């Protein structure tokens, strides 16, 4: 199951030492709903290896502003506490999986 990231816990998760994938989304966003099951599947596949979760941009305003998120879905990838990749828009599972594997 994908983690629930918030403005309050995001820094701690990014700085945990594990690779991180964050899906910035909103309930009203159609493309976000298309990506959501893919994020859940990847969270299960990479459980224990990569912290994979979602951050609701309507409930958490600070973090999207810090990373310049203007469109959703946007997915950010972190390694060693630094952002190393970014994907904007609905993306096929194979593409996202390759980006997650590149974090390992």
Sequence positions of predicted segments:
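Conserved residues in the N-terminal Rossmann fold of short-chain dehydrogenase/reductase
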Residues: 54
């Amino acid at each position: 199951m994908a983690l629930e990231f918030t403005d309050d816990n995001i820094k701690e998760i990014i700085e945990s030492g594990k690779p991180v994938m964050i899906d910035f989304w909103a309930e009203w966003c159609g493309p976000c709903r298309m990506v959501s099951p893919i994020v859940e599947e990847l969270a299960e596949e990479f459980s224990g290896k990569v912290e994979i979760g979602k951050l609701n941009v309507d409930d958490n305003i600070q973090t999207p502003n810090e990373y310049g998120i203007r469109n959703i879905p946007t997915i950010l990838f972190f390694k060693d506490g630094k952002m190393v990749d970014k994907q904007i828009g609905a993306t096929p599972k194979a593409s996202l999986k390759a980006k997650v594997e590149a974090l390992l």
